């Protein structure tokens, strides 16, 4: 499985969980906002899952990149997309039933503003052991990602779901491609990068945590 396919596997798992949660957490006609939607992969999947569940969603996705949003618009023509910042969401006060935040800035005050009382936001972050085997190669003293149930003012913590798998990279180019998709490529010591470049294959865990919060009524 190459780096793109391996990353895609994690994306599929995340989308399945996000779709299931969206159906569970919303009513018959939910207003849904995907913050930092990127190319719209999750946005389109969630919209279709809601429709297949017999709901009539109104859905929008925002991102700061106009070129990326052009790609997103091709994913699902019934979703509205707009260029906007996480810190200035183009939504009215108390107008959103469900907000998705997948690896995007946590603008908690804006989330609290746009969500209706009893509405939910889903927050996706790297799991405790995400890319652990790669980090063991890159660093002399690798660290485990901190996983915690963080309280946010005005919200009730509902649940957490863990997604884990192992990816198998059998080509040095795929290892480097995966490394280039991570923040580690900007802050790894030269010695660690050189060690990674010498690898011909790598089995590496991927792990994601999906946190659910409810706005207090």
Can you say where each PLM-predicted feature lies in the sequence?
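Conserved SAM/SAH-binding beta-strand->alpha-helix loop
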Residues: 65
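Conserved SAM-binding strand-loop segment of SAM-dependent methyltransferases
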Residues: 77-89
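Single conserved hydrophobic/aromatic residue that forms the stacking wall/gate
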Residues: 2-13
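Conserved Class I S-adenosyl-L-methionine
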Residues: 163-217
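Conserved class I S-adenosyl-L-methionine
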Residues: 29-38
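Conserved SAM-binding loop of SAM-dependent methyltransferases across substrates and taxa
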Residues: 39-54
């Amino acid at each position: 499985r190459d780096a793109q396919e391996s990353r895609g596997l994690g994306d599929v798992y995340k989308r399945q969980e996000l779709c299931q949660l969206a159906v569970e957490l919303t009513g018959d006609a939910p207003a849904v906002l995907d913050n930092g939607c990127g190319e719209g992969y999750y946005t389109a999947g969630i919209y279709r899952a809601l429709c297949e569940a017999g709901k009539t969603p109104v859905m929008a996705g925002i991102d700061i990149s106009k070129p990326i949003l052009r790609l997103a618009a091709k994913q699902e023509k019934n979703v509205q997309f707009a260029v906007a910042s996480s810190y200035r969401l183009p939504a009215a006060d108390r107008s959103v039933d469900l907000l998705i935040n997948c690896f995007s800035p946590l603008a908690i005050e804006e989330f609290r503003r746009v969500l209706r009382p009893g509405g939910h936001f889903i927050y996706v972050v790297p799991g405790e052991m995400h890319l652990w085997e790669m980090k063991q190669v890159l660093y002399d003293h690798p660290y485990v990602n901190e996983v915690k149930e963080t309280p946010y003012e005005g919200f009730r913590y509902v649940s957490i779901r863990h997604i884990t798998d192992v990816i198998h990279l059998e080509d040095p180019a795929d290892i480097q491609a995966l490394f280039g998709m991570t923040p580690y490529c900007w802050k790894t010591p030269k010695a660690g990068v050189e060690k990674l470049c010498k690898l011909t294959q790598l089995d590496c865990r991927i792990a994601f945590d999906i946190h659910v919060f409810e706005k207090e009524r």
